[in-house]
Amino acid sequence: MAHKKAAGSTRNGRDSESKRLGVKRYGGESVSAGSIIVRQRGTRFHAGSNVGIGKDHTLFAKAEGQVKFETKGPQNRKFVSIVPAA
């Protein structure tokens, strides 16, 4: 009786590709319009002023300026805004 499984019969050996989620531009960084700021699943970060949200909840800059992260509201939600360059 074999004490090792035959080659090719293992139940392991697969893994999903990483999705490269997370913050792409940090607070204080300069961005141009269209730059991706955060890639996320769901709204961990909410869109503030001059920030748009894509169908996959990606946050992107609508204007040129500096990235600003802030916490607001009774639920302490995290918002990302773009402060236009003056």
Curated annotation (Swiss-Prot):
Keywords: Ribonucleoprotein, Ribosomal protein. Pfam families: Ribosomal_L27. It comes from the Bacteria. InterPro entries: Ribosomal_bL27, Ribosomal_bL27_CS. GO terms for cellular component: cytosolic large ribosomal subunit. Signal peptide: none annotated. GO terms for biological process: translation. Residues 1-26 are annotated as: Disordered. GO terms for molecular function: structural constituent of ribosome. Belongs to the bacterial ribosomal protein bL27 family. This is Large ribosomal subunit protein bL27. It comes from Marinobacter nauticus (strain ATCC 700491 / DSM 11845 / VT8). The lineage of its organism: Bacteria, Pseudomonadati, Pseudomonadota, Gammaproteobacteria, Pseudomonadales. The gene is rpmA.
